[in-house]
């Protein structure tokens, strides 16, 4: 028992104000739907005015087998949001010039979870960096392609909630910048 507890992911439990009030094993939290409020980080990747999305996989706890950002993770107990962003991005998180920028914090809730989502965005400027991010199950999506598929089960529940905000902020600004180039 003790060995399995050491390997367990420990998640902070938040109050409704977003303050840490304790911790719980991820496996226990998942067995009690929506009972605990946990922080997560998500990183949107934008390249040439398009969003890069990958398949979440069939075993994903929320929105399995749907398209979503390549970087997302729980914030572990006693870890900062910023360190979680770096860890989630792997070797890309080591380069300061590639660090994503914080965009918005919101509460995501469905029948299984309640999460405090910290959404970041990374605007990739070079093909070399994009090649390091690419995964076999990933694809660049235009805003139009996304709009045509919203609500059809193609995208994760998180993404469905975030897209309008992204479209009216970062993607809009990115398209203005592209037009001036």
Regions found by a protein language model. Name each.
Residues 29-32, 59-64, 139:
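A short local loop/turn or secondary-structure capping micro-motif enriched for an aromatic residue
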Residues 53, 68-103:
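The catalytic Nudix box helix
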Residues 38-71:
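A glycine-rich, hydrophobic loop/mini-helix early in the fold
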Residues 27-31, 103-109:
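Short, solvent-exposed loop/turn elements at beta->coil junctions and helix N-caps
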Residues 26, 57, 134-135:
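Residue-level structural signal for beta-strand termini and adjacent loop
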Residues 64-67, 77, 104, 111-181:
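Nudix hydrolase/Nudix homology domain
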């Amino acid at each position: 028992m003790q060995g399995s507890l050491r390997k367990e992911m420990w998640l902070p439990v938040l109050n409704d104000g977003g303050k840490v009030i304790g911790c719980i094993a991820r496996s226990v939290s998942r067995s009690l739907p929506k009972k605990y409020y946990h922080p997560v980080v998500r990183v949107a990747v934008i390249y040439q005015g398009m969003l890069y999305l990958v398949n979440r996989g069939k075993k994903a706890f929320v929105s399995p087998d749907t398209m979503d950002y390549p970087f997302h993770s729980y914030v572990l107990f006693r870890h900062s949001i910023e360190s979680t962003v770096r860890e989630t991005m792997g070797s890309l998180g080591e380069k300061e010039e590639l660090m994503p920028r914080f965009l918005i914090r919101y509460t995501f809730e469905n029948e299984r979870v309640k999460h405090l989502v910290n959404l970041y965005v990374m605007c990739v400027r070079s093909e070399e960096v994009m090649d390091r991010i690419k995964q076999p199950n990933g694809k660049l999506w235009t805003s139009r392609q996304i709009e045509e598929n919203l609500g059809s089960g193609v995208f994760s529940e998180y993404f469905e909630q975030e897209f309008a905000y992204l479209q009216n902020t970062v993607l809009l600004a990115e398209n203005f910048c592209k037009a001036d180039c």
